[in-house]
Amino acid sequence: MKAKLFNFQGSDYLTFTLEGMFFPVTLPVITKGNRSKANAWTWNGCLEKPTLRPSIRTKYSNLEGEETEIHYWLNDGVCDCLSDCKDGNANRKIPLKEI
């Protein structure tokens, strides 16, 4: 399994970790209804090969303690990094770790 779904205070969250990263990403996801007025990502319902929309932009500290940023689409369990990534992963494909 590449992702885990859990509920916290009535909202559903999906958590996953990219290969090479030391921290999980946890995002609110829509499991019922549509994205209209929802502050959450749409999700394809698959824990093995999750797809989320819209894109994901995450700021984090690298191993040197410098703030950096990754920006990607999550498609079928693979992180498709966009060209504006500032962490050296621009235009790369990164799989998700097993949970």
Q: Where do the model's predicted regions map?
A:
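A short Gly-Trp-Pro
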Residues: 1-15, 23-99
